[in-house]
From Swiss-Prot:
Part of the 30S ribosomal subunit. Forms a bridge to the 50S subunit in the 70S ribosome, contacting the 23S rRNA. The gene is rpsO. Pfam families: Ribosomal_S15. GO terms for cellular component: cytosolic small ribosomal subunit. One of the primary rRNA binding proteins, it binds directly to 16S rRNA where it helps nucleate assembly of the platform of the 30S subunit by binding and bridging several RNA helices of the 16S rRNA. Forms an intersubunit bridge (bridge B4) with the 23S rRNA of the 50S subunit in the ribosome. This is Small ribosomal subunit protein uS15. Belongs to the universal ribosomal protein uS15 family. It comes from the Bacteria. PANTHER family: RIBOSOMAL PROTEIN S15, BACTERIAL AND ORGANELLAR (PTHR23321), SMALL RIBOSOMAL SUBUNIT PROTEIN US15M (PTHR23321:SF26). It comes from Dictyoglomus turgidum (strain DSM 6724 / Z-1310). GO terms for biological process: translation.
């Protein structure tokens, strides 16, 4: 369920804004999206894992807040990010 160091490193390299960036909204949203995808797959198999479901809902809420922040701050970066991640249609 958790992301490995290698998976995190690849996501950070893909979405970072500069060499030392690991905390920009884009990186945070991309990491949360990957964790949400993995946890969603886990919950398809383990339907009664309510504790993980609560964690999933918290992650979705955190991602939603970060997306809203990015949308208000820089709409072009927001549009590019949701297109790259395949969020919203």
């Amino acid at each position: 369920m958790a992301l490995t160091k290698e998976e995190k490193r690849q996501i950070i390299e893909k979405f970072r804004l500069n060499e030392n960036d690991s905390g920009s909204p884009e990186v945070q949203i991309a990491l949360l999206t990957e964790r949400i995808k993995k946890l969603t797959e886990h919950l398809k198999v383990h339907k009664k894992d309510y504790h993980s479901r609560v964690g999933l809902l918290k992650m979705i809420g955190r991602r939603r807040k970060l997306l809203k922040y990015l949308q208000e701050k820089d709409f072009e970066r927001y549009k590019k990010l949701i297109q790259e991640l395949g969020l919203r249609k």
